[in-house]
Regions:
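Juxtamembrane intracellular "pre-TM" segments in multi-pass secondary transporters
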Residues: 2-30
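Extracytoplasmic gate region of multi-pass secondary transporters
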Residues: 22-92, 177-181
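Transmembrane alpha-helical cores of Major Facilitator Superfamily
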Residues: 38, 78-82, 109, 133, ...
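Hydrophobic core of transmembrane alpha-helices in multi-pass small-molecule transporters
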Residues: 38, 127-141
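Intracellular juxtamembrane helix-capping segments at the cytosolic ends
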Residues: 51, 141-154
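Cytoplasmic membrane-interface "Motif A"-like loop-to-helix N-cap segments
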Residues: 96-108
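C-terminal ends and interior cores of transmembrane alpha-helices
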Residues: 109-123
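A late C-terminal transmembrane helix in Major Facilitator Superfamily
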Residues: 139, 153-185
Length: 185
C-alpha cells in the first residue's frame, strides 16, 4: 500500500510518500491504523492488568487451590512477558515478508480470536499459560508493526513526528481496555 506506484514505461517505479503530521491526520489510513492500535492496546493492557485476577477466578472455579491458582497466574504472566519480546522480533520479520497491511490483519485476526476464547479456553494452568503466551506474542508484535506501518504509509522522513500521533491510540486503549474488562467482569 505505502509507496505509490507510478508508471515508467514497462517498469513500475515507486515514489515514496513523505507526509507531515498535519497532512497525515486528514487521511483515512491514519485513522484506520489509529483505531486498530486502540484495540491492540486494549487487548494487551487488559491482559497485563487482569491476568492474575482472571487466573485466580477461572482456576479456582475449576477447583484449583488458591495457592496453585496464584502460582499458575504468576507463571502465565512470566510466559506473557517472554513471548511479548519474541513477538516483536517475529512479527517484524512477518511484516518484511508480507507487508504492513497483511501483517496487521493477521496479527489482529489472531488476537481477536484469542481474546474471544480466553475465558473458555484458559481453564487449566497449562492453557492459561498458553493463552497468555499467545496474547503476549501478538501484543509484542504491535510494537514492531505500527512504527513500520507509519513509515510505510506516511514516509520515513517524518516518522519521528508522525508516529507519536499514532501512538496516542495506545494511551486510549490503556484507559478504555482495563476499565471495560473490569466492567464486563
Amino acid at each position: 500500500v505505502p509507496p505509490s506506484a507510478a508508471s515508467g514505461g514497462d517498469k513500475k517505479t515507486f515514489i515514496p510518500v513523505e507526509m507531515p503530521w498535519q497532512e497525515m491526520l486528514g487521511k483515512v489510513s491514519f485513522w484506520t491504523i489509529w483505531i486498530i492500535f486502540v484495540f491492540g492496546g486494549m487487548a494487551g493492557l487488559t491482559v497485563i492488568g487482569n491476568i492474575a485476577r482472571f487466573g485466580l477466578d477461572v482456576l479456582q472455579s475449576a477447583s484449583v487451590t488458591e495457592t496453585a491458582a496464584k502460582a499458575a497466574a504468576g507463571t502465565a504472566m512470566a510466559w506473557y512477558a517472554i513471548f511479548n519480546g519474541l513477538g516483536r522480533i517475529v512479527w517484524g520479520k512477518i511484516l518484511d515478508v508480507v507487508g504492513s497491511k497483511m501483517a496487521l490483519f493477521m496479527l489482529f485476526f489472531v488476537q481477536g480470536l484469542l481474546m474471544l476464547t480466553l475465558y473458555k479456553m484458559g481453564v487449566t494452568a497449562v492453557m492459561l499459560a498458553v493463552y497468555a503466551s499467545a496474547i503476549g506474542f501478538n501484543y509484542g508484535g504491535t510494537f514492531a508493526l505500527f512504527p513500520a506501518a507509519t513509515a510505510q504509509l506516511f514516509g520515513a522522513k517524518n516518522v519521528g513526528s508522525n508516529y507519536p500521533f499514532v501512538f496516542t491510540a495506545y494511551g486510549i486503549g490503556g484507559i478504555v481496555g482495563p476499565l471495560l474488562a473490569g466492567f464486563i467482569r
